[in-house]
UniProtKB/Swiss-Prot annotation:
Cofactor note: Binds 1 FAD per subunit. Binds 1 heme group per subunit.
UniProt protein name: Nitrate reductase [NADH] 2
CDD domains: cyt_b5_reduct_like, eukary_NR_Moco
Binding, heme: H577, H600
Gene name tied to this protein: NIA2
Origin: domain of life: Eukaryota
Length: 917
């Protein structure tokens, strides 16, 4: 049945104040968004409940004081709502909805549709939004729908609370209204995609074209989430309650096109239980019951957060240990690094990295007056008085906007604006609403200006960046908002200033960014190329490319590299590369001659010719940014799994920040562990610097040996969070020892000969496996989980295994069980044995270690020979129940002929449950 909001359904609601009288009368009584608005129905008037129901969470605040505050707020809100609804035309059944599942919903005809007919995603025209002032009329509030709007009945609706709670419950709407005290406050809601079209004009994101009106302010009333969770007896953190998940009722095409998915997301328990955050299960907006587009009959409101966390048509609240696993929780509302495109994000699991999730809004501001294409005549009248610039500003997390500044000279000087805060902070001092700003400027100053730009500051002194930071989802765009000015002749004999906003919402054409984009495309048209004077013998039939053109092809969609002046398109080879796609992607768009030569065989060099597409124009080339020293070569398929930069450890200085840069390190200590094993300590460039290498990944050590670049992969033996240095345990392969390798190891012998104080370079991180903690991994970007780890290593292959063991044992809450089989030629060849044995003795329930050597002395307590099925069955878990994950690092014959066949016999799914470093 359609959603009905006849007031007869709300028998348990307390009587309200007088309804708001609007400046028009609907042709038929009834709420405009009701499916029965065209039938006889009582008018849905604005309601404010009696103050006795106001929520009071502080014992030291008397109900009398609280009620007095609520009375004044109710009157204040009532007047603002009355003003905001003035001059508001009726909503209608839009013909564009006629053949959609939303055909029953009445909507305001002025709303700008951003995604065609359906689903309904819209924002108000910016000047219209501002015309109505501080409180946005509900029909003009922006709408974000992922699918059709559910049809709901108040009397039939329930909200289930389950998961880690002592008393799982289902609440009816009448119970939520009558059994809980409520909160009522004004809050600004903002879509994380607000101002996205500006980003789409630079480079297309995955999102549609929000303008700068994806923001609205309403008065919300609802039940505090923390009260509901307390009623249900939410568990403690130790009891497993770490996250609170929300799930709506709509059926959506989630995941890989599967039907029946619900929109869902989650927040941390600490947020959910914090009364200062005013998180509510809202059932009223601007004094009326929720409309269908805004979540009737109940939705989540989380002030200061992005709109994507505020689930509409709320059906379930689930208290969990892990964050929501909902498709929309991971594949939406993320700010990924600018280098990540859609294919890379999917292949390498950027969606699942927690540091890129968006919760709180960032600081933002917009110029609303002058509006787009407004013309200011320049005459004797207008030049005698200042022109008033206006706009809005907001911040997230309850932070107050404390300053707004405007520049008309490109940022050389700034003028401080007057601020209009029309809200009172809550009792915890938090501000949930936008503010308005204004500034009077001289018209002649505008006449000489090329643009007007605005930036805001909040109480934590956060401000907006000057330049845009593009990201795949096009979210949280908050660079300076710029309005361009141009001189025009609006009337004969008169000049004026015409103002241009950067974009217009949706598919509307216009804005200065569209013009600039057109000019850039025209300028980028390829000129006719002449033969390069610097390459007189170059084959003139080959296509020629500039360095700037090569730089553009730096992603998995189009991956070009330069080797010896030749250009190769490696895109179709990415997935076939033995070392993984990121070995190429990390060098995409650069000259990687030196590194290619350092690690590739003659066979590989011949194969490269199949991908040659042209030659590099070298005249005048002097770019440092794509020199060999600034490119990175790796051996893994997960470029995504770089160390979390900045957000995860904001107080730390990370060495491995730029994957295309080499980091100089100095040898400060060298320890001889055995006749052919050394431990090297390298100091990072800055004393307080951390390497920044995720667990499970490795680095490249770079050295110039005999005038040629040499690169080798190593996994540090030091902990990932050690400050100022890192350590490598390296086996030295001396020349003349092994008949198959008479020259020995080039890099290991070089390291052994290095004096203290020598400088080398490192690159990274690299690798397709990352351990996230508590049994969770990402492998080629996809999440995996295991209760038990079967870890098989041979020789120096122990180092990545050692790194994971070290990380697990360091976390007392990580209960992952580890079973290690470590094979070597002799007992003396066992690396890091003292540490392994010490851990096995200290943590017998968490780590078990078994050694295998080809030949042993008398009294050897472990296995002799090679890794066999019998040894594996005795010392590692089988793969029957799927709780174990096997991983191996060692010589290829060991993995190919011993480890993998026997794992298959032990019921391991080799494709899913076996990792090779």
């Amino acid at each position: 049945m359609a959603a009905s909001v006849d007031n007869r359904q709300y028998a348990r609601l307390e009587p309200g104040l007088n309804g708001v009288v609007r400046s028009y009368k609907p042709p038929v009584p009834g709420r405009s968004d009701s499916p029965k608005a065209h039938q006889n129905q009582t008018t849905n008037q604005t309601v404010f409940l009696k103050p006795a129901k106001v929520h009071d969470d502080d014992e030291d605040v008397s109900s009398e004081d609280e009620n007095e505050t609520h009375n004044s707020n109710a009157v204040y809100y009532k007047e603002m709502i009355r003003k905001s609804n003035a001059e508001l035309e009726p909503s209608v059944l839009d013909p564009r909805d006629e053949y959609t599942a939303d055909s029953w919903i009445e909507r305001n005809p002025s709303m700008v549709r951003l995604t065609g007919k359906h689903p309904f995603n819209s924002e108000a025209p910016l000047n219209r939004l501002m015309h109505h002032g501080f409180i946005t009329p509900v029909p003009l509030h922006y709408v974000r729908n992922h699918g059709h709007v559910p049809k709901a009945q108040w009397a039939e609706w329930t909200v289930e609370v389950t998961g880690f709670v002592k008393r799982p419950m289902k609440f009816t709407m009448d119970q939520l209204v009558s059994e809980f005290a409520y909160r009522e406050f004004a809050a600004t809601l903002v879509c994380a995609g607000n101002r996205r079209k500006e980003q789409n004009m630079v480079k297309k994101s995955k999102g549609f074209n929000w303008g700068s009106a994806g923001v609205s302010t309403s008065v919300w009333r609802g039940v505090p989430l923390c009260d509901v969770l307390r009623r249900c007896g939410i568990f403690s953190r130790k009891g497993g309650a770490l996250n609170v998940c929300f799930e709506g009722s709509e059926d959506l095409p989630g995941g890989a096109g599967t039907a029946g998915s619900k929109y869902g997301t989650s927040i941390k328990k600490e947020y959910a239980m914090d009364p200062s955050r005013d998180i509510i299960l809202a059932y009223m907006q601007n004094g009326e019951y929720l409309t269908p587009d805004h979540g009737f009959p109940v939705r989540i409101i989380i002030p200061g957060f992005i709109g994507g966390r505020m689930v509409k048509w709320l059906k379930r609240i689930i208290v969990t240990t892990k964050e929501s696993d909902n498709f929309y929780h991971f594949k939406d509302n993320r700010v990924l690094p600018s280098l990540v495109d859609a294919e890379l994000a999917d292949e390498e699991g950027w969606w699942y990295k927690p540091e890129y999730i968006i919760n709180e809004l960032n600081i933002n501001s917009v110029i609303t007056t002058p509006c787009h294409e407004e013309i200011l005549p320049i005459n004797a009248f207008t030049t005698q008085r200042p022109y008033t610039l206006k706009g809005y500003a907001y911040s997230g997390g309850g932070k107050k906007v404390t300053r707004v500044e405007v520049t008309v000279d490109g940022g050389e000087t700034w003028n401080v604006c007057a601020l209009d805060h029309q809200e009172k902070p809550n009792k915890y001092g938090k501000f949930w609403c936008w503010c308005f700003w204004s500034l009077e400027v001289e018209v002649l100053d505008l006449l000489s200006a090329k643009e007007i730009a605005v930036r805001a500051w909040d109480e934590t002194l956060n401000t907006q960046p000057e330049k845009m930071i593009w990201n795949l989802m096009g979210m949280m765009n908050n660079c300076w908002f710029r309005v361009k000015t141009n001189v025009c002749k609006p009337h004969k004999g008169e000049i004026g200033i015409v103002f241009e906003h950067p974009t217009l919402p949706g598919n509307e054409s216009g804005g200065w960014m569209a013009k600039e984009r057109h000019l850039e495309k025209s300028a980028d048209a390829p000129p006719s190329l002449k033969k390069s004077v610097s390459t007189p013998f170059m084959n003139t039939t080959a296509k020629m490319y500039s360095m700037s053109e090569v730089k553009k092809h730096n992603s998995a969609d189009s991956c070009w590299i330069i080797v010896h002046g030749h250009i190769y398109d490696c895109t179709r080879f990415l997935m076939d590369h033995p070392g993984g796609s990121d070995s190429i992607l990390i060098n995409a768009g650069t000259d990687c001659t030196e590194e290619f030569e350092a690690i590739h065989s003659d066979k590989a060099k011949k194969m490269l010719e199949d991908y040659r597409i042209g030659e590099l124009i070298t005249t005048g080339y002097s770019s440092d940014s794509s020199s060999p020293n600034n490119s990175v070569h790796g051996s893994s398929a997960v470029f995504s799994l770089l160390a979390p930069i900045g957000e995860a450890t904001p107080v730390r200085n990370l060495a491995l920040v730029n994957p295309r840069a080499k980091v100089p390190v100095q040898l400060v200590e060298k320890t001889s562990i055995s006749h052919d094993v050394r431990k090297f300590r390298f100091a990072l460039p800055v004393e307080d610097m951390v390497l920044g290498l995720p667990v499970g990944k490795h680095i490249f050590l770079c050295a110039t040996i005999n005038d040629k670049l040499c690169l080798r992969a190593y996994t540090p033996s030091s902990t990932v969070d050690v400050v100022g240095y890192f350590e490598l345990v390296v086996k030295i392969y001396f020349g003349g020892v092994h008949p198959r390798f008479p020259n020995g190891g080039l890099m290991s012998q070089y390291l052994d000969s290095l004096p203290i104080g020598s400088t080398l370079e490192i690159k990274g991180p690299l690798g397709h496996v990352e351990y996230l903690g508590k049994g969770s991994f990402t492998v080629h970007g996809k999440p995996k989980f295991a209760d038990k780890l079967a870890m098989l290593a041979g020789g120096t292959g122990i180092t990545p295994v050692y790194q994971i063991i070290q990380a697990i044992l360091k976390d007392p809450e990580d209960e992952t069980e580890m079973y290690v089989i470590y094979a070597n030629r002799t007992e003396e060849d066992i690396l890091l044995r003292e540490e392994l044995d010490g851990w096995a003795e200290q943590y017998p329930d968490r780590l078990k270690v078994w050694y295998v050597v080809e030949s042993a002395k008398e009294g050897w307590a472990y296995s002799t020979g090679f890794i066999s099925e019998a040894i594996m069955r005795e010392h590692i878990p089988d793969g029957l129940d799927g709780s174990a994950l096997a991983m191996a690092c060692g010589p290829p014959p060991m993995i190919q002929f011993a480890v993998q066949p026997n794992l298959e016999k032990m019921q391991y799914n080799i494709k899913e449950d076996f990792l090779i470093f």
